[in-house]
């Protein structure tokens, strides 16, 4: 019995398990969406729980998952990136620049390919930004299926690249797809950020103060019309790091926070996120081949993303603008570049904005195309890295 519990504990702690759990919930949602329970599933996830009258917004269960729970995931990412920037693989500026440059390439090429393929249909030209985003949660989930063979520096490179990608996507949403950005709330968000910077500068070590200001930051960003999960990344990066503090109490609090966030995200938030965002009913896709939209999205994500990410990474290193992460080769960068083609939720979010004034069928086609493209990208990226590390393991 004791051996059983030891094996069970090891299984749940294995990073592969969390990645498989994410994919399991994704396919569970797809399965339910194509059964007689489709209407029930759709009703539950979209049920308006709260109405925010001042901003004419309904808060459904899906909003709670995407706007509130996912903030905790982004908070963990922000803390991790801050750690790597101060004492880890991103401490070297030339290595920290690389994911930013790679992200730029990963946004330019997909958009160009999408525009080239869909140029004959002006009704879908507004969807160019669908292909620029990377879904951090799913990309990391797929990478973690490979388990302990993945170097930590490669995971950090993917996280950093995806963060730059998301920031780019959020800026695109703000400038191209937002009809009513609340400037007052943007100003309030800026003031909250400056306040957090100030208390960090004063070496305040009470973690609860940062959490309180983090809640204020989330609310102000949410009400501004910008995707609220960015508040998690901002808070994580702005929180003080134990490397320049002598407070053992703060260090213990941060260690507990990191451990709690890791468990919560891996085994609860990310699987729920997958379940709420993967429900696509295939019966809505008649005459799919008659539209240029699926081809623009597919080739933008599956080809444009890896070409842009890899090419800009390669040129950046060759022209000595940046350096590769420690222990990482261009072959591994190539594998990661395919995983960047997993657009999924952010791409779906942008498609809803891009085609909100067009018929609903276009949005269904876009969602289906994003799903297929993301699956293909994840399979290619996974197999590429799997066989690469298998080959390295055999050599050693």
Curated annotation (Swiss-Prot):
Keywords: Antiport, Cell membrane, Ion transport, Membrane, Sodium, Sodium transport, Transmembrane, Transmembrane helix, Transport
UniProt-annotated location(s): Cell membrane
TM regions (residue ranges): 17-37, 59-79, 97-117, 127-147, 156-176, 181-201, 206-226, 260-280, 292-312, 333-353, 368-388
Annotated InterPro entries: Na/H_antiporter_dom_sf (IPR023171), NhaA (IPR004670)
Any Gene Ontology biological process: regulation of pH
Gene Ontology cellular-component annotations: plasma membrane
Family per record: Belongs to the NhaA Na(+)/H(+) (TC 2.A.33) antiporter family.
Identification of the protein by name: Na(+)/H(+) antiporter NhaA
Native source species: Wigglesworthia glossinidia brevipalpis
Organism taxonomic ancestry: Bacteria, Pseudomonadati, Pseudomonadota, Gammaproteobacteria, Enterobacterales
């Amino acid at each position: 019995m004791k051996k059983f519990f030891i094996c069970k504990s090891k299984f749940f702690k294995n990073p592969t398990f969390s990645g498989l759990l994410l994919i399991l919930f994704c396919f569970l949602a797809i399965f339910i969406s194509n059964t007689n329970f489709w209407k029930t599933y759709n009703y539950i996830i979209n049920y308006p729980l709260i109405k925010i009258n001042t901003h004419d917004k309904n808060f459904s269960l899906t909003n709670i998952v995407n706007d509130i729970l996912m903030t905790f995931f982004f908070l963990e990412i922000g803390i991790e990136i801050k750690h790597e920037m101060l004492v880890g693989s991103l401490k070297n500026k030339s290595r920290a620049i690389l994911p930013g440059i790679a992200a730029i390439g990963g946004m330019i090429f997909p958009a160009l390919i999408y525009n080239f393929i869909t140029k004959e249909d002006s009704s879908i030209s507004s969807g160019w930004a669908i292909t620029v985003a990377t879904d951090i949660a799913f990309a990391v989930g797929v990478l973690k299926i490979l388990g302990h063979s993945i170097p930590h520096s490669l995971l950090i490179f993917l996280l950093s690249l995806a963060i730059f990608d998301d920031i780019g996507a959020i800026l695109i949403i703000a400038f191209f797809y937002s009809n009513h950005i609340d400037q007052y709330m943007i100003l309030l968000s800026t003031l909250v950020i400056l306040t957090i910077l100030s208390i960090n500068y004063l070496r305040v070590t009470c973690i609860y103060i940062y959490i309180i200001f983090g809640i204020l930051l989330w609310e102000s960003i949410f009400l501004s019309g910008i995707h609220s999960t960015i508040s998690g990344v901002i808070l994580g990066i702005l929180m003080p790091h134990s490397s320049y503090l002598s407070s053992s109490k703060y260090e213990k609090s941060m260690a507990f926070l990191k451990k709690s966030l890791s468990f919560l995200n891996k085994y609860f938030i990310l699987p729920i996120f997958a379940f709420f965002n993967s429900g696509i009913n295939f019966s809505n896709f008649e005459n799919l081949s008659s539209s240029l939209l699926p081809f623009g999205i597919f080739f933008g994500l599956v080809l444009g993303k890896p070409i842009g990410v890899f090419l800009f990474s390669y040129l950046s290193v060759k022209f000595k603008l940046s350096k590769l992460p420690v222990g990482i080769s261009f072959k591994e960068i190539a594998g990661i570049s395919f995983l960047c083609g997993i657009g999924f939720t952010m791409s779906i979010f942008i498609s809803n904005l891009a085609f909100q004034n067009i018929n609903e069928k276009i949005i269904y086609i876009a969602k289906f195309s994003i799903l297929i493209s993301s699956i293909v990208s994840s399979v290619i990226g996974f197999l590429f890295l799997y066989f690469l590390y298998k080959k390295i393991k055999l050599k050693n």
